[in-house]
Amino acid sequence: MVDMKASMFLTFAGLVLLFVVCYASESEEKEFPKEMLSSIFAVDNDFKQEERDCAGYMRECKEKLCCSGYVCSSRWKWCVLPAPWRR
C-alpha cells in the first residue's frame, strides 16, 4: 500500500513538473517574434544620421513620440504608418 502511495505522489509531481516546463517554454515562444523583429530592424549607432525630437519609421516609440504621419504601434512599440481603419 505504501508503494502505491509513493508511486502516485511521484506521478503527480512529474505531471506538475511537466506542466511548469511546458508553460515556461510556451511563454518564451510568445516573446520570440518580438525579439526577432527587433533584432532585424535594430539600427546600429554607426548608421544613425542624427538625433530627432521624434521617432521615424520602425523606430522605438517608448520614450519618444512618433514623427508626423506615423503612429506608435500598441503591439510592437514601433512607429508605423497608420492603418486605414485607425484614421
Curated annotation (Swiss-Prot):
Residues of the signal peptide: 1-24
InterPro entries: Huwentoxin-1, Huwentoxin_CS1
Location in or out of the cell: Secreted
Record key words, sorted: Disulfide bond, Ion channel impairing toxin, Knottin, Secreted, Signal, Toxin
Top-rank taxon, per record: Eukaryota
Claim: Metal-binding is one of the keywords in the record: no
Record remark: domains: The presence of a 'disulfide through disulfide knot' structurally defines this protein as a knottin.
Entry protein name: U3-theraphotoxin-Hhn1a 9
Species this chain originates from: Cyriopagopus hainanus
